[in-house]
């Protein structure tokens, strides 16, 4: 891989992926949402280009170059709150994903990598595999599932290799402020009382740098086409333990109130990835433990 395109690059995974690609000598082009306040966090440099192109503009974008290798489509509108069940918005996301495949073809890419979600599965009491039955209960999960299926067909038609990566819970420096880990760190570093659910749910957290390494390895792989992968650490622990670890590392005096926040409707109580297919195909193995990942965020 010599040249790559990324949409949705301003989140934790996107930032980590840019850093990984640049370290590996890959030239990176970022397509970013016009007016994004976070684009300033993307580094400038000889080997990185930034092109303003919102999701609804990909269809009309005429690229100046057509010698790219891999297209990473991370961007998605409506990932939190009520927007997850906004049917019209989620339908547009499917269209945008198909537009991204068309753009990948125009840019000369040999491979399209789309990012899905554990939300495609709904509820499961076993580790998630590419073959685990999918029963999404949110509009977001339904749209991700449909986007994965339809972009595969579009890639097949256009002669582009395809991979769909169902991402579980990834954390990093550029997480939303309301994410569990980011909000816990904020409360604990300010020694404020922090309320959470009971924390009984078994959860799989992966550091953004490990996620970026997985996406890089998938991009380099030319042997496996139309592959679906689950991306996580492959291990799970009670959410309560993760929160207590953060509290300890912050050396916080905060009172933790487990049970202050009720479980949501259809609360996922078990989340763990089976990464064996990903490891077998690409050699990916997570290397950053949860404690080390949190320490890095605190430094």
Where are these regions (language model features)?
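N-terminal Rossmann NAD(P)H-binding glycine-rich loop of SDR-like oxidoreductase domains
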Residues: 4-24
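NAD(P)H-binding glycine-rich loop region in Rossmannoid oxidoreductase-like domains
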Residues: 53-92
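Conserved Rossmann-fold NAD(P)-dependent oxidoreductase catalytic core, especially the SDR/UDP-sugar
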Residues: 73, 98-137
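Active-site Tyr-X1-5-Lys
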Residues: 123, 135-163, 189
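Glycine/proline-rich active-site loop of Rossmann-fold NAD(P)-dependent oxidoreductases
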Residues: 145, 158, 163, 170-182, ...
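Substrate-binding strand-loop-helix patch
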Residues: 173-178, 200-212, 228-248, 288, ...
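C-terminal "lid/loop" region of Rossmann-like NAD(P)-dependent oxidoreductases
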Residues: 198, 228-229, 240-243, 251-270, ...
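Conserved C-terminal active-site "lid" loop/helix of NAD(P)H-dependent oxidoreductases
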Residues: 208, 262-296
């Amino acid at each position: 891989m010599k040249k790559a395109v990324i949409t949705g690059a301003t989140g934790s995974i996107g930032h980590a992926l840019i850093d990984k690609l640049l370290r590996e000598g890959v030239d990176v082009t970022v397509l970013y949402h016009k007016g994004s306040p976070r684009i300033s966090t993307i580094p400038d440099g000889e080997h990185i280009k930034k092109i303003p192109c919102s999701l609804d503009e990909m269809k009309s974008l005429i690229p100046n170059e057509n010698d790219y290798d891999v297209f990473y489509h991370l961007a998605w509108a409506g990932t939190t709150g009520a927007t997850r069940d906004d049917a019209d918005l989620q339908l547009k996301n499917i269209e945008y994903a198909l537009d991204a495949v068309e753009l990948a073809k125009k840019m000369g890419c040999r491979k399209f990598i789309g990012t899905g979600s554990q939300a495609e599965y709904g509820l499961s009491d076993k580790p998630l595999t590419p073959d685990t039955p999918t029963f999404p209960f949110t509009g977001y999960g339904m749209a991700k599932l449909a986007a994965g299926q339809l972009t595969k067909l579009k890639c097949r038609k256009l002669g582009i290799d395809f991979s769909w990566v169902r991402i579980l819970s990834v954390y990093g420096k550029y997480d939303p402020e309301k994410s569990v880990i980011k909000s816990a760190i904020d409360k604990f570093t300010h020694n404020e009382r922090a309320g959470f659910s009971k924390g009984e749910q078994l959860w799989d957290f992966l550091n953004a740098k490990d996620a970026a390494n997985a996406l890089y390895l998938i991009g380099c792989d030319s042997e496996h086409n139309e592959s679906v992968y689950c991306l996580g650490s492959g291990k799970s622990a009670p959410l309560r333990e993760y929160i207590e670890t953060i509290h300890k590392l912050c050396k916080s005096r905060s009172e933790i109130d487990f049970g202050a926040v009720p479980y949501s409707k259809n609360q996922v109580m078990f989340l763990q990835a089976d990464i064996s297919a990903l490891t077998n195909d690409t050699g990916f193995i997570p290397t950053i433990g949860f404690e080390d990942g949190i320490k890095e965020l605190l430094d």
